[in-house]
Amino acid sequence: RNITWTGNSVYSAETLNEVLKINKGDVYDVVTMEKRLFGGGKQSDFYVSQLYRDNGYLFFQIEPVELNIEGDSVDVEMRIVEGKPATLNNIVINGNDLTNERVIRRQLFTYPGNLFSQSDFERSIREIASMGQFDPEATMDPAKGWSILPREMDNTVDVVYNVTEKPSSQL
């Protein structure tokens, strides 16, 4: 029936509804709603969490709460805690024994002092993976290729890129 938003001050309910793409009268589908809130759908899909995280709101949280369930209709209240924008603090590169760090940093879109952006972070990972000097699978692997270290107490975040250099050719 209705989707309402509480706790949102950065984006209007209208903007959030445009990103959510669920309208009054649509079939209620929890899986689709969660993909449009948190991601996990197609790579090209834009989702509510990304909207916030692209503008520094790394500490953003959202909880959909089902209210007024009547027959086949349900109202959903989206409870948001926006938090404060996070600024990039340290950008660390590990594993580059042969490649000069400056060569890697030229590929990055994450800079100390800038607001954190999920899209810039993901683009930096793709750029490192496509350089040719590093194992792209290891670079793209969230378990070992990179880490985001948020510090909510001072609204900063450190980003660590762990590169795995390919063996150099020998004659």
What are these regions (language model features)?
Residues R1-L171:
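Periplasmic polypeptide-binding modules associated with outer-membrane biogenesis and secretion
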